[in-house]
Amino acid sequence: DAFEELGELTVHDRTTPEEVVARCAGCEVVFTNKVILNAEIIDLLPDLKYIGVLATGTNVIDLEHASQKGICVTNIPGYSTDSVVQHILAFMLHFSSMVSIHNDAVHQEDWVNSKDFCFTLGTLNELSGSTLGIIGLGTIGRKLARVADAMGMKIIAAHQSSMNRLELPYELEWLPVDEVFARADFLSLNCPLTPETDKVVNGERLQKMKTSAIIVNTGRGTLVD
């Protein structure tokens, strides 16, 4: 209702790339989540003054071109920090304890048919004492580090000059990015997608990693080659 008080509001649950221009024609304000507004589309929307990205990542918008056209672009940082951290932790617990594998085995009656009361299909690894490497120590990365610290993990992060003087309530070791790859038992990608971070995980860096290491990418897909 608050939006409708400001002007005419039209909501489209889903929009294909072919429908974007027609649906946005004449609009001064456009809100989007996954729908891409690139330079070509922006040029076809001369009335557009504001783009609101209903997410944290802004890679669906050509930010440089929007700025050149005088179009304001905003996003929603920090709205899902706890959810993302919980999701990362779920993956880490899943792989360290082989949750789904044991769940499937129990449902297939492997445990009741086992000769041993203690039923395991392999080594279960504790998170405590293992090393978590973080690429991107922004809001999500810092919250993840807090949780990992509470679980007894060693935390290392890729060196960021802007973070050097940041006082953190946990012990963290700053390292060159290649060394983070080499030392991590778990590697969490929490950086935005930029020209510098595109394919930050590549063949050369994968060769540096432990064969047992796990990569959890809750950022953009092309952070990984």
Name what the model sees in each region.
Residues 1-27, 156:
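N-terminal glycine-/charge-rich "phosphate-binding" loop or analogous flexible N-terminal tail
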Residues 137-138:
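Glycine-rich Rossmann-fold phosphate-binding loop(s) that bind the pyrophosphate
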